[in-house]
Amino acid sequence: MREKTPKQIVDLLDKYIVGQNEAKKSVAIALYNRYRRTQLPEDVQKDITPKNILMAGPTGVGKTEIARRLADIVDAPFVKVEATKFTEVGYVGRDVESMVRDLANEAVRIVEKEEFVKVESQAIRQANKTLVRLLVPGVKRNNRQNQMQQMQEMMQSLLAGGGMPEETEEVTDEIRNQRLSVAEKLDRGLLENEEVTIEVEQAPKANPMGDMMGQMGMDMSSMLGDMLPKKKVKRTLPVGQARKLLVQEEEKKLVNYDDIYQKAMDRAGQSGIIFIDEIDKITAADKRNSAGVSREGVQRDILPIVEGSTVSTKYGPLSTDHILFIAAGAFAESKPSDLIPELQGRFPIRVELNALTKDDFVRILKDPQNSLLKQYIALLKADGVDLVFTAEAVDKIAEIAFEVNQGTDNIGARRLATILEKLLEEVLYEGPDMEMGQITITQAYVEQKLSDIVKNKDLTKFIL
């Protein structure tokens, strides 16, 4: 399947993000260049590195939203991290290499999902066979082997990677006929609500040492593999739910995880994308730096990752040479030139996002696929209430949002969510008790609910 063209990517972003065409174009071109590179000879491919992007603009204008929507659009491993979460090597906290390990985990998840689809029909057949055996159990054999022989068989099975040996059972002609009947009913979907008891692997508990081991590229559970028996728990579920769990277990048995890890590492290295948000908060000029922790040190730690280096992950080494990095920040109290020169040079494409106007707010309220107004209309529809906004009301909401942003801190489109929540507070509260019908939000209603608050600057600061 051919990759999406830059125009197609921009069209998809337009469904959710108003304006900021320059940023959309830059991101779309950078993404499509990944595809162009794959069409070249290998000796040329290795010399073409991604052109990393630095997006600067006020808060609430769409930087993070572009990243969020990109994750849905691109068929590539994508992770979003915040620069403020990282600490310099030597301090307690996440090291910068963890973003690459997160990308490796995401790549494995994507490839694993693709491989599961390939074996799904086989896994379903196997799960149905298991369900038939559980619904019509056989007669347990009275095994008279001595304990030493049982222990030997168990150890041989564990060393061979087969887990604990299953108990043998005897199937009589009567049981065989019953199983054929149950199998037919299963195929016709007649037993979906019947309860069945199954054994499933217990989800691993969070290990406080796990993250530390992960940072060193080690994973003890992977290293031990199948040497230790998997802990299983019994669960009684309807057949439909039980089948889903059994299919998942069968899929894991049918796929080759060595191949999955190899494909995932290749995909993460060749087409992975890392979005670094809040990069302006780690500049030396930012006033919010905590004393003692050098933000410049974090920049210097990020530098080799962006330049291209090899990071150890639990799936193997991952090279960052061809990973695309997109950094974003408001740069309200600093500017891109406050980043260390070496890091600036690694983000050759600079994009400035514009502050939002009143007209932008009107479009944000109405145009996107799941705009704020459409969300509230859908929420009240659940109570049987039809919520309608007049054009004048929408215009007034946008005007108030713009005025409040100008008069207090400018938080961009996020101001709309605060204003709408305050505006519709009473409607949302009374909604379940209202008779089914239509509620129309007019300009007069908006002014009645919000004008007094907007005029009082002290109230505005605390409420809107």
Curated annotation (Swiss-Prot):
Q: Name one GO molecular function term.
A: proteasome-activating activity
Task: Specify where it is mainly localized.
Answer: cytoplasm
**Which intervals of the chain form a coiled coil?**
none
Residues annotated to bind ATP: 18, 60-65, 277, 342, 414
> What Gene3D superfamilies does the record point to?
1.10.8.60, P-loop containing nucleotide triphosphate hydrolases
Q: Mind listing the GO biological process terms from this record?
A: protein unfolding; proteolysis involved in protein catabolic process
- Location relative to the cell: Cytoplasm
Family annotation (SMART domains):
AAA, ClpB_D2-small
Enumerate the InterPro entries for this protein: AAA+_ATPase, ATP-dep_Clp_protease_ClpX, ATPase_AAA_core, Clp_ATPase_C, HslU, P-loop_NTPase
One family name in Pfam for this protein = AAA
- UniProtKB keywords: ATP-binding, Chaperone, Cytoplasm, Nucleotide-binding
Any one GO CC term of this protein is:
HslUV protease complex
* Subunit structure of this chain's protein: A double ring-shaped homohexamer of HslV is capped on each side by a ring-shaped HslU homohexamer. The assembly of the HslU/HslV complex is dependent on binding of ATP.
Instruction: Briefly state the protein's biological role.
Output: ATPase subunit of a proteasome-like degradation complex; this subunit has chaperone activity. The binding of ATP and its subsequent hydrolysis by HslU are essential for unfolding of protein substrates subsequently hydrolyzed by HslV. HslU recognizes the N-terminal part of its protein substrates and unfolds these before they are guided to HslV for hydrolysis.
UniProt lists the family membership as follows: Belongs to the ClpX chaperone family. HslU subfamily.
Q: What is this protein called?
A: ATP-dependent protease ATPase subunit HslU
Q: Which organism is it from?
A: Lactobacillus delbrueckii subsp. bulgaricus (strain ATCC 11842 / DSM 20081 / BCRC 10696 / JCM 1002 / NBRC 13953 / NCIMB 11778 / NCTC 12712 / WDCM 00102 / Lb 14)
List the lineage, top down.
Bacteria, Bacillati, Bacillota, Bacilli, Lactobacillales
